[in-house]
Amino acid sequence: MGVKGQLLQDPFLNILRKERIPVSIYLVNGIKLQGQIDSFDQYVVLLKNSVTQMVYKHAISTIVPAKAISIPIPADTQTEQDEP
């Protein structure tokens, strides 16, 4: 994943982790996992519920927060939507 992916992914996961927002994580095989983001790196997300699960990012389809969040994006940064 390039730099652009990290401009959205890291702040999104960081807000979920810091604010301990419950999430539903849907895997590419359709399985739904629920819990709170405990930690993450370039390849995995640690999801904490009654136990902590290591979920590989390549297996994740969608992450749905339990409440709406706002991601601060620097004004001088273009997103893929801004490009022609």
From Swiss-Prot:
**Gene3D superfamilies xrefs:** 2.30.30.100
Enumerate the GO terms in the molecular function aspect. Answer: RNA binding
**So which residues are the signal peptide here?**
none
Q: Name one GO cellular component term.
A: cytosol
Cite the SUPFAM superfamilies for this sequence: Sm-like ribonucleoproteins
What is an annotated GO biological process for this record, any one?
regulation of translation, ncRNA-mediated
CDD domains, per the entry: Hfq
Q: Which UniProt keywords apply?
A: RNA-binding, Stress response
Q: Which residues form the Sm domain?
A: 10-69
**Family designation:** Belongs to the Hfq family.
So what does this one do? RNA chaperone that binds small regulatory RNA (sRNAs) and mRNAs to facilitate mRNA translational regulation in response to envelope stress, environmental stress and changes in metabolite concentrations. Also binds with high specificity to tRNAs.
PANTHER family (alphabetical)? RNA-BINDING PROTEIN HFQ (PTHR34772:SF1)
Subunit structure, interactors included: Homohexamer.
Name used for this protein in its record:
RNA-binding protein Hfq
Q: Which organism is it from?
A: Nitrosomonas europaea (strain ATCC 19718 / CIP 103999 / KCTC 2705 / NBRC 14298)
Tell me the gene name.
Answer: hfq
